[in-house]
Amino acid sequence: MTVRRATIEDAKEIFAIEMDCFSVPWSLDSIETELMNQEKKLYYVIEDTEGVVGYAGAWLVYDEGQITNIAIRPSARRQGFGATLTRALIEECFKRGMHEIFLEVRISNLSALSLYRQLGFTVKGMRKNYYSEPKEDAYIMSLIKEERK
């Protein structure tokens, strides 16, 4: 299992993961745009022996990180890829001076909620009807650098 910074060459693999994981995936153009300008953005991929199995990204805004996506191929879930990838993203955000990291998660995504809580995230609020297809609320979660586990 290897975590590394994503490059533009990873765009098609990331797009394939988006298609596998999300009901409303980002377009290939959007992914390429994100990967081309990583000064205020961080994108990582995680690989196994067969290639990229997941990716995660965050936007860096002043002293806050906003996790945009964390996605692991369905066939690679429950093997530690998500935790390893998310920890790497968190560490880099804090290394770059972020004080707090935010994310949104479907209230029904119990696996992700469990992982985020294990990593020290806490629920700060809710966004009504944040997701579409299916329509669902999102929890807003955050991790403060000084309070992390």
Q: What does each model-found stretch correspond to?
A:
Residues T86, N109-A112, N129-P134:
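Short glycine/proline-centered loop/turn elements that form peptide/ligand docking sites
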Residues K135-K149:
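Terminal substrate-recognition subdomain of acyl/acetyltransferases
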